Amino acid sequence: MQFKPALESATLLKRYKRFLADIELDSGEMRTIHCANTGSMTGCATPGNKVWYSTSDNPKRKYPNSWELSETAQGHRICINTARANQLAVEAIENDVISELVGYDQLQTEVKYGNENSRIDILLSASDKPKCYIEVKSVTLLDEESPSGQGYFPDAVTTRGQKHLRELTEMAQTGSRAILLFTVLHSGIEKVSAAHHIDAKYSTLLKQAQDAGVEVLCYKAELSNTEVKLISAIEFIN
C-alpha cells in the first residue's frame, strides 16, 4: 500500500479522547490529527516520539490529517492505523505474498457468518477447495525487554477478539478452512505469542481454536513514509 503523497513527519505531543492526537510540525505549528486506533497503543504513543501523518482531500473532514506511523526512541517503526491491517492483508493475498493462501478464485470482505452475528474480514473461495475464513489482527505490542523481538496480541482484554476465535473454531469444526492472520506492524517484532498475561481467556480460546484446526499465520510488514506492505512470514509461538 503506497502513500501518495508521502507521509509527513511531526513530533507527538499527546494522544487523548482515543481518537485525537496533538502534534508539533518542524515549523513549530501545533496541529490536531485523527487517530484511528482506539486501543491501548502500549509503546506506540510516547510523547516526544516522531510520527507520520497522511492528509485527506475530503473537505467534510473536521481533522483532515490521520496518524499513520510512529517511531520509537529505539528507531522501530509502527503502523498504528488499525484500518490498514485488512487493506494490507487483501493486498498481500492478491499479490500472492502469503504462500499459504495462494490458489483461490474469489476474495470477499466483511461477509456475515457464524452464530454470533459476526462479519469475517476476508472470505476466500474456489471451486475445488473448502471456503477459507480469515480473521485479521494487527500486532504492535513489543516486549521491550525481550532480546529476541517478542511481540504479543492482544494489548488489552478483547471480548470482540474472543468472539472471533469462537466463530473461527466453529468454521473449522464444520469443515471450512479457518485462519487467524496476524499482520505484524512493528519493525522490532520478530515472533508473536498470545498475551496470556494480558488476556488469559483469549490465550485459552486460541489454543482451543488451534486444536480444532484453526491455522495461525503471522506476516510482518515493511514500513516507510511512502509504502507499507506485508513481506514475510514470522514465527507464532503459543
Curated annotation (Swiss-Prot):
Q: Which CDD domains match?
A: SfsA-like_bacterial
Give one Pfam family, short name only. SfsA
One GO MF annotation is:
DNA binding
Question: Could you say which protein family the record assigns here?
Answer: Belongs to the SfsA family.
Q: Which PANTHER family match?
A: SUGAR FERMENTATION STIMULATION PROTEIN A
Protein name, per record: Sugar fermentation stimulation protein homolog
Record organism = Vibrio campbellii (strain ATCC BAA-1116)
